[in-house]
C-alpha cells in the first residue's frame, strides 16, 4: 500500500468512518498530502511535517500513529494557506501545539468565565501603567502632532542600501546595487561577518530610498489621529490590547506599508492580517524582511486597510510592538496608548533613543526563544513582543501577590 492511500485512510478514520476499516499504521516515509493550491514546496512541507512530528512525540510519547497525525495537521495548514500565508499559519499552529496543556478545572463554566475576567482586569490595570508617556514617545521618534507638508521635489536620491546617488526618473532601470543587508556591530557586518571595508555580500537590480523626514511623509500620505479616524461607538468589538507589526516594501515613492498584522493580547489569536497596495510602483518587495513575494488580488487600498484596522481598535486600544514608531509612521497614525518593548526594560539595559536592544535578543533573554531565524514573519514578531510584555506583567502580578 502506498503512502497516499494510507494518508487518505487516516483522513477517513478521523471523520468517523473507521468501523469497517482495518487499523492503520504509520507510513514508513513521510509524504505530504496533495492540495489544490501551491502554498509551499514539497521539501518545505515535508520538513514542517517532521517538525510537527517532533513536537507530537515529545508532548505525547504514547500517541498512536504520530506520523499520520503530523501529516494531517500539516495538510489542514496547507489547505487553508496561500504561498504568502503558509509560513504564518504554520507558525500559529506550532504555537498552539507547544502551549502547555492545562489541567482540568474544578470550576463551573460561569466561575471560569468570572475568573478569566478578573485576571484580565488585573493585567489590563498593569498594562495601562506600562503605557509610555507622550514625552518619552516623542524622544524616541514618535510623531504626536501632524507635521507640516513639504512635497518631495528632489530629482536625485541617495540609495538606502549602497549609498549611491541616483536619479528618481531612472530608478526602475536595471543596475547593480551591491550592499550589506545586515547592520554593523563591533566593526563587522552581521550578515556575513566581514569587516566594514569588506566586499558587499548582497546584490539588487535597483537602487532604493526612504522618505527621511516627517514632512515628506506627510506630503505623500497625511498623518491621522486614531481618536478622529476610528469610531468608539461599538467598543465591544474592539480589542483592548493588540500586538501589531507592519511590513514595508520599496517603491518609487519610498518605503511604503504593505502588510499589517495584529494579534489580540488576551487570546493570542490573529485578529487582522491584511496586505496593502502601495501608492508607488514596486521596486523591491524587501522579501527578506517583509516575507512578501508578489502583489495579488488580496491587496487592499489604503482606505480599505484603515477601515479594517478600525474594526478591531480605537483610540483607547493599547498597542504593543517593538520599535513601534516605525510601524506608526508606516500607517501614518498618531496614537497615545503605546507599549514599546524597545523602550520598557530594566535600568541595567540602559535603553535610549540611539541604543536599543533588538526583539531577537530580548526574546532570547526573557523568553529563551529564538526568533527571526529565517524569512521574516510579522505574526512571530507580534507574538514575541506580546510575550515579552506578559513576562513583565506576570512578574508584576507576582510582586503584588507576595506583598499583599
UniProtKB/Swiss-Prot annotation:
Q: Which residues are in coiled coils?
A: none
GO terms for molecular function, please? Answer: exonuclease activity; nucleic acid binding
Q: Which Cys residues form disulphide pairs?
A: none
EC assignment: 3.1.-.-
**Which ranges does the record mark as transmembrane?**
none
The domain of life is Eukaryota
Residue ranges under compositional bias (Polar residues)? 1-17
Q: Where is this region: Disordered?
A: 1-29
Q: Where is the composition biased (Basic and acidic residues)?
A: 18-28
What role does it play?
A: 3' to 5' exoribonuclease required for proper 3' end maturation of MRP RNA and of the U5L snRNA.
Which protein family is named in the record? Belongs to the REXO1/REXO3 family.
Q: What is this protein called?
A: RNA exonuclease 3
Amino acid at each position: 500500500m502506498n503512502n497516499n492511500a494510507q494518508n487518505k485512510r487516516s483522513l477517513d478514520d478521523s471523520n468517523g468512518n473507521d468501523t469497517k476499516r482495518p487499523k492503520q499504521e504509520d507510513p514508513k516515509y513521510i509524504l505530504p498530502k496533495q492540495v489544490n493550491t501551491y502554498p509551499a514546496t514539497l521539501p518545505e512541507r515535508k520538513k514542517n511535517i517532521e517538525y510537527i512530528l517532533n513536537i507530537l512525540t515529545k508532548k505525547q510519547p504514547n500517541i498512536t500513529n504520530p506520523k499520520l497525525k503530523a501529516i494531517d495537521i500539516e495538510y489542514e495548514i496547507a489547505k487553508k494557506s496561500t504561498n504568502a500565508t503558509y509560513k504564518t499559519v504554520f507558525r500559529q499552529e506550532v504555537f498552539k501545539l507547544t502551549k502547555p496543556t492545562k489541567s482540568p478545572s474544578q470550576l463551573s463554566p460561569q466561575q471560569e468565565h468570572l475568573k478569566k475576567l478578573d485576571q484580565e482586569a488585573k493585567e489590563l490595570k498593569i498594562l495601562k501603567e506600562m503605557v509610555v508617556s507622550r514625552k518619552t514617545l516623542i524622544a524616541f521618534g514618535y510623531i504626536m502632532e501632524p507635521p507640516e507638508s513639504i512635497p518631495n521635489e528632489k530629482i536625485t536620491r541617495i540609495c538606502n542600501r549602497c549609498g549611491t546617488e541616483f536619479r528618481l526618473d531612472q530608478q526602475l532601470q536595471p543596475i547593480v546595487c551591491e550592499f550589506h543587508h545586515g547592520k554593523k556591530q563591533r566593526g563587522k557586518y552581521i550578515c556575513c561577518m566581514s569587516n566594514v571595508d569588506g566586499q558587499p555580500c548582497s546584490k539588487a537590480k535597483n537602487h532604493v530610498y526612504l522618505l527621511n523626514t516627517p514632512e515628506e511623509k506627510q506630503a505623500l500620505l497625511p498623518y491621522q489621529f486614531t481618536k478622529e479616524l476610528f469610531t468608539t461607538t461599538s467598543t465591544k468589538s474592539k480589542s483592548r490590547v493588540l500586538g501589531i507589526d507592519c511590513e514595508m516594501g520599496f517603491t518609487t515613492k519610498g518605503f511604503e506599508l504593505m502588510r499589517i498584522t495584529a494579534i489580540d493580547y488576551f487570546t493570542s489569536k490573529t485578529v487582522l492580517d491584511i496586505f496593502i497596495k502601495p501608492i508607488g510602483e514596486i521596486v523591491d518587495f524587501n522579501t527578506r524582511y517583509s516575507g512578501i513575494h508578489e502583489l495579488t488580488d488580496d491587496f487592499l487600498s489604503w482606505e480599505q486597510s484603515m477601515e479594517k484596522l478600525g474594526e478591531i481598535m480605537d483610540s483607547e486600544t493599547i498597542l504593543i510592538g517593538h520599535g513601534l514608531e516605525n510601524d506608526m509612521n508606516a500607517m501614518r497614525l498618531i496614537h497615545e496608548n503605546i507599549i514599546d518593548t524597545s523602550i520598557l526594560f530594566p535600568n541595567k539595559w540602559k535603553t535610549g533613543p540611539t541604543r536599543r536592544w533588538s526583539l531577537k535578543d530580548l526574546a532570547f533573554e526573557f523568553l529563551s526563544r529564538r526568533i527571526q531565524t529565517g524569512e521574516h514573519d510579522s505574526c512571530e514578531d507580534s507574538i514575541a513582543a506580546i510575550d515579552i510584555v506578559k513576562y513583565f506583567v506576570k512578574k508584576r502580578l507576582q510582586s503584588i501577590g507576595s506583598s499583599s
